[in-house]
Amino acid sequence: MNSLKKDYRKLYHIQDKFLSWWGNLGLPFYLTGGTALGRFYLNHRCSEDLDFFVNRDPFFPRYIEEIKNAIERHFRVNLQQALFTDDFSRIFITEDDLSLKIEFVNDVSYRSGNTVSYYFGLLDTPLNILSNKLNAIISRDEPKDIFDIVYIAVNYSFNWQVVFAEAKQKAVINEIDVEERLWNFPLSLLENIDWNIESVDLDYFNRVLRKIADDFLLGNDNSVCIKDSPITEAKPL
């Protein structure tokens, strides 16, 4: 493993403690984002936060109140950094010298496919995560998004036109903009990362990313996949 600046083993220990407790609440949130993908599907990188989504749920404020009332009985919560709005909440729990960020989002109504039942509750799928990542790269420069897109493409088979159609159900995006973000991604952003499991071959990564950009723009089948693993049939580890 790469020499890590953060102690991900300790962070994962805190994550595991939270997820074990979380499973008893029975709330309809599903774990998504980099932690869902990295810890429970691909094991391709480390992820320090927990992101939980529901989809346009009118009871979101009620869920957050339930979480707030229960979490302080089991964890040390940093309320000074907490944030609560109508459709978004952020909570930090601390243990020793580490802080775990947990975010709750009342997302748009559409999602790609169904969630997966897992030991801690509901887990997102690579297809929905990928369609979210396409939207994310338009609005932010986050190397983890590109890293995740590449690893999803290498590990699962799918058609890019189908995935883009899923992404457009959630936001107004243009395929030219997505292709440009993929093609012009600055590889220098991957030079000093501390969350990769294995070292990154930048030349290989760039070749794969350029092929992904071409496949995406043409609406082709994903040609960089090295496995016979349809993304719609993806199973957690």
Regions found by a protein language model. Give the residues of each.
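Compositionally biased terminal segments of proteins
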Residues: 1-237
